[in-house]
Amino acid sequence: MATQTLNLDVVSAEDKLFSGVVQTVQVTGSEGELGIYPGHAPLLTKIKPGMVRYVSEAGDEELLYVAGGVLEVQPGHVIVLADVAVRGDELDLQEAEAAKKRAEEAIADSGSDVTYAEAIAELSRALAQIDIIRKLKR
C-alpha cells in the first residue's frame, strides 16, 4: 500500500519554517495553484508570492506566506525554497495594506519600466499577504 503522507521542508534564507510529515501541500506556482498529494509526480517549478498551505499528519491546517522561490517535488518529499517566508499568523494586515497602497501609487506615478516592474512585484506580494490574513480570519 502506498504511503499517505509526505515529508515537507519549507526553508528561507533566514530560517527553516517547517520540517515534518504532512498529508497535502498547496502552493502558488508560476502557472497557478498546485495541489501536491502523496504519489505526486516529480516536479521542479518557480513559485510566485502567495500561500503555502499544508495539512499536518494530525489534520491541522497551516498557512505560510512566501515571496517567491522554488518548489521541488520528489517521491515522498516536498521542498519549498522561499526567497522570504513568514508564518501566516505573523503577518500584519495594516502593514500589508500600506504596502499595497504604496505599490498602487508607484504604479500610477511610474516613469520607467524598472519602477513599474518593481511596483507590480510589490503589489503582488502585498495582495498575497492580505489574502492569507483574510483566510486565517475565517
From Swiss-Prot:
Topology class, membrane: Peripheral membrane protein
GO cellular component, one term: proton-transporting ATP synthase complex
InterPro entries, sorted: ATP_F1_dsu/esu_C_sf, ATP_synth_F1_dsu/esu, ATP_synth_F1_dsu/esu_N, ATP_synth_F1_esu_C, ATPsynth_dsu/esu_N
Entry keyword annotation includes Membrane: yes
Coiled-coil zones: none
An example Gene Ontology molecular-function term: proton-transporting ATP synthase activity, rotational mechanism
Chief subcellular location: membrane
Record keywords: ATP synthesis, Cell inner membrane, Cell membrane, CF(1), Hydrogen ion transport, Ion transport, Membrane, Transport
Highest taxon in the source lineage: Bacteria
Subcellular location as annotated: Cell inner membrane
Chain's role: Produces ATP from ADP in the presence of a proton gradient across the membrane.
Description of how the protein assembles with itself and partners: F-type ATPases have 2 components, CF(1) - the catalytic core - and CF(0) - the membrane proton channel. CF(1) has five subunits: alpha(3), beta(3), gamma(1), delta(1), epsilon(1). CF(0) has three main subunits: a, b and c.
Family designation: Belongs to the ATPase epsilon chain family.
NCBIfam families: ATP_synt_epsi, PRK00571.1-4
Protein name: ATP synthase epsilon chain
Native source species: Idiomarina loihiensis (strain ATCC BAA-735 / DSM 15497 / L2-TR)
